[in-house]
Amino acid sequence: MRLLIDECIDQRLRLLFPAHDCQTAGFANLAGLKNGSLLDAAEAAGFEVLITVDQNIPDQQNLDGRTISLLILCAPTNRLRDLEPLVPAANSALGSIGPGRVLRIK
């Protein structure tokens, strides 16, 4: 599965998803794009899941009909030490996530 790590997340998080093709927004040349434009560009680049900590995206963007889904990591901060405990649940969730869906990992 092709995963895109949002630019507000520590890029080392990608190393915790070894079973997937995981890239950061910066590496994929998608840094600086805002929510709607980022989703459009990520879909066009073939990404299936955007991993983010931005819990507002589902309220700001309609995901109906999109091929990309959102995996929102709900942690106290976007630091790796706070996100790392959520990774096992995130990896499990990737097995059941479908296009246009939003999953929150707490």
Annotate each predicted stretch with a short phrase:
Residues 28-29, 57, 76-78:
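Short histidine/acidic/glycine/proline-rich micro-motifs that form metal-
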Residues 1-48:
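N-terminal first-folded block
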Residues 19-25, 66-73:
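Active-site regions of enzymes building and remodeling cell-envelope glycoconjugates
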Residues 42-63:
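Acidic, metal-binding active-site segment of PIN/NYN-like and related structure-specific nucleases
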Residues 68-106:
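C-terminal structural segments of small proteins and small subunits
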Residues 6, 53, 73:
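Active-site-adjacent beta-strand anchor residues
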Residues 13-19, 59-66:
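Short loop/helix-cap segments at secondary-structure boundaries that form the rim of catalytic
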Residues 9-13, 57-60, 90-92:
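Intrinsically disordered, low-complexity boundary segments flanking structured domains
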